[in-house]
Curated annotation (Swiss-Prot):
Biased composition (Polar residues): 236-253, 724-739, 887-912, 970-981
Annotated positions of the Phosphoserine modification: 344, 372, 1063, 1066
Protein name per Swiss-Prot or TrEMBL: Nuclear factor of activated T-cells, cytoplasmic 3
Pfam families recorded: RHD_dimer (PF16179), RHD_DNA_bind (PF00554)
Comment text on domains: Rel Similarity Domain (RSD) allows DNA-binding and cooperative interactions with AP1 factors.
Gene from which this protein is expressed: NFATC3
Domain named RHD: residues: 415-596
Ranges for region Disordered: 18-37, 205-306, 711-739, 887-988, 1049-1075
Post-translational modifications: Ubiquitinated by STUB1/CHIP, leading to proteasomal degradation. Phosphorylated by NFATC-kinase; dephosphorylated by calcineurin.
GO cellular component terms given for this protein: chromatin; cytoplasm; cytosol; nucleoplasm; nucleus; transcription regulator complex
Length: 1075
């Protein structure tokens, strides 16, 4: 290329060269840069060149810069280097047109332009550098008509190996590397017209800037650089420094195909807008002076420069633009971070778009300025290192946020805040963004052609309220935008935008900003307002469906996408200088009047969970319900596709208007062991569906209280009983403890049998007790007892002594079966001696029950031992005689020792707890449910109120009142009733477990009485865990009858002497002092 075409064109060419910063050195007379074309730089020319002696005739555009001299000087070396030397870049034009073959014509205008423009820029730069170029090259330099859209490209463009000289490989050919091949460029860039226009404009505008002289590091710099480094080879070292960001890039590397460099380099071109490699080359032209000397450095300053760009620029710059580029490259080298990474072709192709932003400005800027701009871009968009095959600096691709990454720490730099579609948590650390008042579920959005319909209202009146918790140091902005409300991840809504509302009634300040084409409303959160804001300044604007649907890549349909969410986001400053980003979205808001009138809407539903067996009735309340409405339950997999879908059975006769009653269908997998969340929705047709609501299926076992199950065989190994204690406030002492019977699973179970045993042991202990403080006998009519859960705590054994009771009952049946010992003649009250001390553990195993000493330190305080189990248990501190009546099998009454425990100050009076079961059956039979060890354990704590009698009606069918143990505990100085409610088998894996007879809250103050009628429970006792599967009621009756026959009358008399008969009043059901 010669300076013959210089002049106005030369100036343009120079500018273009700088902008392109990659103009290849003018090829030798025989070589013609085919890839140069007036893409982005005015200095680029497309020429039909008569085949010079060394070149094939090919139209091509050459910069007017003085690149020829460099090219001529460097071309030999370049050819020798086989494209590995940056010098070769200067000579690239030659190699492009080298004898290897004439440049291959590309019929794709955009591609030709792209390829040509980089080369042209470079070549123009070379001309501006006053490099000597053959006349044919000058001809090439002549501005070709815009009609010449294609340029024959030499194979060297695509394959550096094709061009004999390294320089040629470096030239635009190099930028036509595999990644930057015209084909790739062609498919990357499709707006040929715009590119042509840009190229034409840059012909006139870019050349001045492109010219080396015009640029800070003009041709003189390039020449100087050449002088410093001598041949192109010397330039290559320099080039690599310039590419320092890519300093690691070797001549081979940058010469190696840089597919993406061409496209990505487009940003480098002054016409950054050009998406074609030519554009990149043009930009490189501006950078080319620097790039050519140091192709990689030149591009590195333009971290955004792609392989093609910096290769072309470097090649052309090395040849003609080298000097000018050198200074430019030097600056670039310093400007571009050393860590700059080369991007892949794709990245390069994408990046040009970013670079376009500054391409126009850069076109008018001097090469140095362009370089700085490019550098800024490069630093802003770090380059990504490609495989060894792509060792070129590609234009950094714009940073694009990938799809939501759940679990990502929401800490961001202020310079790179997350995009609006980035998922953020609502709570992190001590900070939480919260919507205190949700918006209404319907708000009619207004169109652009109509007036505002006001701000979004709240369902409770007023407006939504948003508050930030955990931070109040200084005011921050609350950002609000309209987001989607579909099943996909949250993102800005395509068809709705937030609309700022102003007026006298608006109390909240706000301002609108645009973030990525989305309108965002900024509302201040002030510490004086407790970091809270009422959103009375936000309306919803509906965009035209056609405007959105016609957008490239838009797949949503406006009329089917009318639900939105109000999305709020804050960026909280952190001490590190970064920000913590939080985001919260409101409930879905329907913005279409038609949809609001036609689509069903579920406002509430009666239950939100049930067992996997289903069958429960659910009442759904809402609007737009029709007689033919259906409710569908479905479960979605991780991929969002339905895995299970079933229709709920609607009970039509119970449905009324806005209420639908349905039967929850069973879950498809009843064997689940954990709760499963599904969804349900109401539909009036295929396209009219309500929002999905959540529903939970729970395993059957989840409805039961899980308690460790202890095999009876392992029970004896338990060393210490665990008395159950329930603490509750007391009127005088503060808390009392109630001992109760415990069920194995703490489930309420009704006992079909008519009796429950009071004492479970192979031998009934002989108990001789006398009541010193209470003259009134306590009578208990056995009946099923409710076992309620309570806190079980171990207690130390209580030592006590007692006189053996004369009544000795031998039990020959199963050791686990309880025995009720009583007189078969009449009511025998067994009075337990209160001041007798309990001195040891009572072993209630298979061996005869040892004497149990009971001691009461306080008069009037009583304790009761409900059951003795085969386990080793601590006996209760105090025992109280309790009489119970039996009207079955000829036994009038049975007296069984019942330990009534008290801990604390004496109670003023003990009240009998009476139960009136309606079972029919033999008098004292052990209920299988009661076979579990039952024990009342002492309860620690301050004095508790006294127990009041509690009437109990057994739900079981029957007419006779059958004996069953009842517990009565009283540990208190004053009387606060301990209420016992419920029924069920007395089955507990541990003999030391007791359940409180009633909820602590139910205890009234002193003197007050409460009568509770427990609801019947139809659950059968669980014998599987009891070990009584083979025991029948008949066996129990036989055993009890046999044992009772062994009781001597004398023993019964002795007991009766010690304990006076109970008064008839105490036998009445439900009668007590407090009742």
């Amino acid at each position: 290329m010669t300076t013959a075409n210089c002049g106005a064109h030369d100036e343009l060419d120079f500018k273009l060269v700088f902008g392109e910063d990659g103009a290849p050195a003018p090829p030798p007379p025989g070589s013609r840069p085919a890839d140069l074309e007036p893409d982005d730089c005015a200095s680029i020319y497309i020429f039909n060149v008569d085949p010079p002696p060394s070149t094939l005739t090919t139209p091509l555009c050459l910069p007017h810069h003085g690149l020829p001299s460099h090219s001529s000087v460097l071309s030999p070396s370049f050819q020798l280097q086989s494209h590995k030397n940056y010098e070769g870049t200067c000579e690239i034009p030659e190699s492009k047109y080298s004898p290897l073959g004439g440049p291959k014509p590309f019929e794709c205008p955009s591609i030709q332009i792209t390829s040509i423009s980089p080369n042209c820029h470079q070549e123009l730069d070379a001309h501006e550098d006053d490099l000597q170029i053959n006349d044919p090259e000058r001809e090439f330099l002549e501005r070709p008509s815009r009609d010449h859209l294609y340029l024959p490209l030499e194979p060297s463009y695509r394959e550096s190996s094709l061009s004999p000289s390294p320089a040629s490989s470096i030239s635009s050919r190099s930028w036509f590397s595999d990644a930057s091949s015209c084909e790739s460029l062609s498919h990357i860039y499709d707006d040929v017209d715009s590119e042509l226009n840009e190229a034409a404009a840059r012909f006139t505008l870019g050349s001045p800037l492109t010219s080396p002289g015009g640029s800070p590091g003009g041709c003189p710099g390039e020449e100087t650089w050449h002088q410093q480094y001598g041949l192109g080879h010397s330039l290559s070292p320099r080039q690599s420094p310039c590419h320092s960001p890519r300093s690691s890039v070797t001549d081979e590397n940058w010469l190696s195909p840089r597919p993406a460099s061409g496209p990505s380099s487009r940003p480098t071109s002054p016409c950054g807008k050009r998406r074609h490699s030519s554009a990149e080359v043009c930009y490189a032209g501006s950078l080319s002076p620097h790039h050519s000397p140091v192709p990689s450095p030149g591009h590195s300053p333009r971290g955004s420069v792609t392989e093609d760009t910096w290769l072309n620029a470097s090649v052309h710059g090395g040849s003609g633009l080298g000097p000018a580029v050198f200074p430019f490259q030097y600056c670039v080298e310093t400007d571009i971070p050393l860590k700059t990474r080369k991007t892949s072709e794709d990245q390069a192709a994408i990046l040009p778009g970013k670079l376009e932003l500054c391409s126009d400005d850069q076109g008018s800027l001097s090469p140095a300025r362009e370089t700085s701009i490019d550098d800024g871009l490069g630093s802003q968009y770090p380059l990504k290192k490609d495989s060894c095959g792509d060792q070129f600096l590609s234009v950094p691709s714009p940073f694009t946020w990938s799809k939501p990454k759940p679990g990502h720490t929401p800490i961001f730099r202020t310079s790179s805040l997350p995009p609006l579609d980035w998922p953020l948590p609502a709570h992190f650390g001590q900070c939480e963004l919260k919507i205190e008042v949700q918006p209404k579920t319907h708000h009619r959005a207004h169109y652009e052609t109509e007036g505002s319909r006001g701000a979004v209202k709240a369902s409770t009146g007023g407006h939504p309220v948003v508050k930030l918790l955990g931070y109040n140091e200084k005011p921050i902005n609350l950002q609000m935008f309209i987001g989607t409300a579909d099943d996909r991840y949250l993102r800005p809504h395509a068809f709705y935008q937030v609309h700022r509302i102003t007026g006298k009634t608006v109390a909240t300040a706000s301002q609108e900003i645009i973030i990525a084409s989305t309108k965002v409303l900024e509302i201040p959160l002030l510490p004086e307002n407790n970091m809270s804001a009422s959103i009375d300044c936000a309306g919803i604007l509906k965009l035209r469906n056609s405007d959105i649907e016609l957008r490239k890549g838009e797949t949503d349909i406006g009329r089917k996408n009318t639900r939105v969410r109000l999305v709020f986001r804050v960026h909280i400053p952190q001490p590190s200088g970064k920000v913590l980003s939080l985001q919260i979205a409101s409930i879905p808001v329907e913005c279409s009047q038609r949809s609001a009138q036609e689509l069903p809407h579920i406002e509430k539903y009666s239950i939100n969970s049930c067992s996997v067996n289903g069958g429960h009735e659910m009442v759904v309340t809402g609007s737009n319900f029709l007689p033919e409405s259906k409710i569908i339950f479905l479960e979605k997999g991780q991929d969002g596709r339905p895995q299970w879908e079933v229709e709920g059975k609607i009970i039509r006769e119970k449905c009324q208007g806005a209420h639908i009653v349905l039967e929850v269908p069973p879950y498809h997998n009843p064997a689940v062991t954990a709760a499963v969340q599904v969804h349900f929705y109401l539909c009036n047709g295929k396209r009219k569906k309500s929002q999905s609501q959540r529903f939970t299926y729970t395993p059957v076992l989840m409805k039961q209280e899980h308690r460790e199950e202890i095999d009876l065989s392992s029970v004896p190994s338990l060393p210490v009983p665990h008395p159950a204690q329930t603490q509750r406030p007391s009127s005088d002492s503060g808390c009392s403890h109630d001992s109760v019977l415990s069920g194995q699973r703490s489930l309420i179970c009704s006992i079909p049998q008519t009796y429950a045993s009071m004492v479970t042991s192979s031998h009934l202990p002989q108990l001789q007790c006398r009541d010193e403080s209470v003259s009134k006998e306590q009578h208990m009519i056995p009946s099923p007892i409710v076992h309620q859960p309570f806190q079980v705590t171990p207690t130390p054994p209580v030592g006590s002594s007692y006189q053996p009771m004369q009544t000795n009952v031998v039990y020959n049946g199963p050791t686990c079966l309880p025995i009720n010992a009583a007189s078969s003649q009449e009511f025998d009250s067994v009075l337990f001696q209160q001041d007798a001390t309990l001195s040891g553990l009572v072993n209630l195993g298979c061996q005869p029950l040892s004497s149990i000493p009971f001691h009461s330190s306080n008069s009037g305080s009583t304790g009761h031992l409900l059951a003795h189990t085969p386990h080793s248990v601590h006996t209760l501190p105090h025992l109280q005689s309790m009489g119970y009546h039996c009207s079955n099998t000829g036994q009038r009454s049975l007296s069984s020792p019942v330990a009534d425990q008290i801990t604390g100050q004496p109670s003023s009076q003990l009240q009998p707890i009476t139960y009136g079961p309606s079972h029919s059956g033999s008098a004292t039979t052990a209920s299988p449910a009661a076979s579990h060890p039952l024990a009342s354990s002492p309860l620690s704590g301050p004095p508790s109120p006294q127990l009041q009698p509690m009437p109990y009606q057994s739900p079981s069918s029957g007419t006779a009142s059958s004996p069953s143990p009842a517990t009565r505990m009283h540990s208190g100085q004053h009387s606060t009733q301990a209420q016992s409610t419920g029924q069920g088998g007395l089955s507990a894996p541990s003999s030391l477990i007791c359940h409180s007879l009633c909820d602590p809250a139910s205890f009234p103050p002193d003197g007050a009485t409460v009568s509770i009628k427990p609801e019947p429970e139809d659950r059968e006792p669980n014998f599987a865990t009891i070990g009584l599967q083979d025991i029948t009621l008949d066996d129990v009756n036989e055993i009890i009858g046999r044992d009772m026959s062994q009781i001597s009358v004398s023993q019964g008399a002795g007991v009766s002497r010690q304990a006076p008969l109970p008064s008839p009043e105490s036998l009445d059901l439900g009668r007590s002092d407090g009742l």
